[in-house]
Amino acid sequence: MMNVPSAAAASSCDDFGYNATPPPPPSLLPIMDQDGGGGSIQRDHHQHHNHQQLGYNLEPSSLALLPPSNAAAAAAHHATIAHASPHDLLQFYPTSHYLAAAGGAGGGGNPYSHFTAAAAAGSTFQSYYQQPPQDAPEYYFPTLVSSAEENMASFAATQLGLNLGYRTYFPPRGGYTYGHHPPRCQAEGCKADLSSAKRYHRRHKVCEHHSKAPVVVTAGGLHQRFCQQCSRFHLLDEFDDAKKSCRKRLADHNRRRRKSKPSDGEHSGEKRRAQANKSAATKDKAGSSSKNAGIGDGFETQLLGGAHMSKDQDQAMDLGEVVKEAVDPKGKASMQQQQQQAHHGIHQQSHQQHGFPFPSSSGSCLFPQSQGAVSSTDTSNIAQVQEPSLAFHQQHHQHSNILQLGQAMFDLDFDH
């Protein structure tokens, strides 16, 4: 029975020409069989054969996975493992074992020839797994990280925090990290744990008791004292009596506190000067404002005087016309002539005041009374024009001259 698979394998190799290295088989090979010697796997391309054992059906697709040269070898393998255990339904073979078996000289290049040799020697399928593998399997399954690697990873994670002498941002669960010790007092024989102390004491590595003690024995047997200004230990010679700060730092501290202050006399003098400057500035502002107000008032009085003068002139002219009409309502021609003469005299006076000569040829038609009145006021008007400061008085005299001219005209009408 054991020679049949080898003969079938040889015939299959001759038929298909696979005398050289056979093609690689699939890594998963389902092998199912219950019968002791009658069961076999046959490959047929034209017929579909269903092989049922223990309720499992082998489909044609699973049979097609086998190469043509291995059909007889598969039948021999089923015959070999049929007597081993009825419960071995699935078997997995690493690729390295398959290639090592395929490279053997026995079996004529058959990759499953070692099964036939084991069966001939009287061994079973279980003895195959008890033999040590020839080569390491190609499959690799990562195992769990060892405890040493975990410790290194946790140590690297704790180094992310800042080492400032107190708890870091990522404190470890088990307390302080590897190689790091809690801060302790540097006094000789104290070694107090400062993990729960204040930040100041942890930073300078001194407990609260020794930071205030007058004499502390430090490393080396030196008698020192903790300076609160320098935040370190000094020899007792550098302190004054029972002071908590050294002599040098205490002198600097007192110098800053006792800076020289200005005397009261100097301070009062500065205040007086500031007040004097302030009062002078206010006086200057008041004087400038009063000057501006005086200029504005003078300008306003000039404008008002000019307005009153124009009003008086208009009233005088209106009064003269009314008187003329009341005295001689019939002599309209003579009254018009007199009005023209009066206006001519007024224009002549205005021209003389501004320095413009007026022709005297037209003055022959005037009455002697009017000529005398005009000539008597010419000198005074010229003098007033030469003095700009007497402008207001000049305007007043002009009003009086106009009134005198009207009175002369009124008297002339009564004479006629």
UniProtKB/Swiss-Prot annotation:
It is found in: Nucleus. A zinc finger (SBP-type) spans 182-260. Probable transcription factor that plays an important role in building the laminar joint between leaf blade and leaf sheath boundary, thereby controlling ligule and auricle development. Keywords: DNA-binding, Metal-binding, Nucleus, Transcription, Transcription regulation, Zinc, Zinc-finger. This is Squamosa promoter-binding-like protein 8. Zn(2+) 1 binds at residues 185, 190, 207, 210. Residues 11-51, 250-299 are annotated as: Disordered. The keyword DNA-binding applies. Expressed in stems, leaf sheaths, and young panicles. Weakly expressed in ligules, auricles, and leaf sheaths at the basal region. Disruption phenotype: Plants show upright attitudes and the absence of laminar joints, ligules and auricules in all the leaves including the flag leaves. The SBP-type zinc finger is required for the binding to DNA. GO terms for cellular component: nucleus. The gene is SPL8. Residues 261-273 have a biased composition (Basic and acidic residues). Zn(2+) 2 binds at residues 227, 230, 234, 246. A motif (Bipartite nuclear localization signal) lies at residues 243-259. One of its GO terms (molecular function) is zinc ion binding.
